[in-house]
Amino acid sequence: KPIPIIVADLEMWEKCAYVNETAKKLIEKFLPGPLTIALKKKDVIPDSVSVKSIAARIPSHPVALLLVKEAGVPITATSANISDRPPLYSVQKAFVTFKKNVNLILDAGRLPRRRPSTVVDLTMDASPKIIREGPVSAESILKELKMWKDEVK
């Protein structure tokens, strides 16, 4: 299963993926926020993270955004849960779940309860494919892209 990453900005994103115009439009409209975009990866991303594509987003949580800005490089960012289990929203539950498997848990306060991010696959240049619908609706994504394409004509 590919490991998603967070990036600080478009410049950082372009260092690790081939960011097409469709992706740039979605980044401009919806990010920072709960939208993850899959794009063809560049060779700087190891195959151990993902083989052909990379899913990335710009986080809206101030601590996550500060961490990736200060690191100066993308950071892997999986959800705070075990696969196929519900997400964890408190550091206490994360500690109980992961105490034997991680070296550090950063307490950034209680996380907002929301669905996991929307995931859009833009690896094929033709059209976006919604992999998972979350807080950013498929309808709003398609509407934004239609408006943009109408402007370009």
Language model: regions and residue ranges:
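Active-site-adjacent structural elements in enzyme catalytic cores
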Residues: 1-153
